[in-house]
């Protein structure tokens, strides 16, 4: 079974490049950042069709001719997700991903999709161990959360049943809006969960259970050794690290750890 993919390419890129009209157009190693993501999805075996959601289609470039669908939506996070999912027939799972993970590979995508489908869950979220992240992306400045099994960072994608998306627009918007405010998030997902998270006592099973409760379905979390899934570009140092990794791949050399 294959899945469809929605890439959310909007967002403010001005914090990195003031001339960037939206985040997906940020130049990384000679290409717009979202182009790296879209091309990896196009080449992945487990992806049927790709829809890239952008705030405007102006100036995207010729690369879009090789991508399935371009969806113009400049609304809220939830609005953009719904617009992207609406580009498909709704007959299979959808891989939601951000457009700011330029080092993503077809192999990483295929592995996550296969693992996710094997769980049979309605929504599946990837976890990357700290050691894997720092090994593949030396010099990376990520935020890690300590689970009972050790420090992890979350991936920038989710495999989900489109019916779950449509039924959870309100809660999805609230979680996204509070994602950087632990107190506000606690009001949405529960204080006990947040406290256990902050204390490093949460288990993966608890994460899965909470995800299922929030969406009114079944949730799962899977570990991936493909750290590119969690290597988003949010600040200038992330650009340096991503370009170093991409250059190292193209030359067959290991990336060094010195961020400039």
What does each of the following model-derived ranges do?
Residues 101-103:
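Acidic metal-phosphate-binding loop of nucleotide-sugar-dependent transferases
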Residues 210, 214-218, 240-260:
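C-terminal catalytic/acceptor-binding lobe
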Residues 220-223, 232:
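Conserved active-site beta-strand element of glycosyltransferases/polysaccharide synthases
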Residues 106-213, 224-228:
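Conserved core of the sugar-phosphate nucleotidyltransferase
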Residues 235:
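Short, conserved phosphate/pyrophosphate- and ester-handling motifs at nucleotide-, phospho-/glycolipid
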Residues 1-19:
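N-terminal nucleotide-binding beta1-loop-alpha1 segment
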């Amino acid at each position: 079974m294959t899945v469809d993919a929605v890439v959310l390419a909007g967002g403010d890129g001005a914090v990195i490049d003031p001339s960037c009209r939206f985040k997906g157009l940020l130049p990384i190693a000679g290409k717009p950042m979202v182009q790296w993501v879209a091309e990896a999805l196009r080449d992945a075996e487990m992806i049927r069709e790709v829809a890239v959601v952008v705030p405007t289609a102006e100036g995207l470039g010729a690369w879009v001719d090789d991508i399935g669908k371009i969806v113009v939506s400049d609304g809220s996070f939830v609005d953009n997700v719904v617009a992207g999912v609406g580009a498909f027939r709704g007959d299979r799972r959808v891989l939601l991903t951000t457009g700011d993970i330029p080092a993503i590979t077809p192999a990483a995508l295929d592995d996550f999709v296969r693992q996710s489908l094997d769980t049979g869950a309605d929504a599946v979220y990837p976890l990357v161990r700290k050691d894997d992240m720092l090994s593949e992306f030396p010099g990376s400045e990520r935020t890690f959360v300590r689970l009972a099994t050790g420090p992890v960072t979350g991936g920038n994608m989710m495999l989900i049943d489109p019916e779950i998306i449509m039924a959870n627009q309100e809660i999805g918007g609230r979680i996204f809006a509070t994602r950087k405010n632990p107190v506000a998030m606690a009001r949405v997902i529960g204080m006990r969960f947040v406290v256990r998270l902050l204390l490093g006592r949460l288990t993966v099973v608890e994460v899965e259970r909470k995800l299922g409760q929030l969406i009114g379905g079944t949730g799962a979390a899977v570990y991936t050794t493909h750290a590119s899934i969690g290597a988003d570009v949010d600040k200038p140092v992330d650009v340096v690290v991503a370009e170093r990794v991409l250059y190292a791949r193209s030359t067959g050399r290991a990336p060094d750890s010195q961020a400039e």
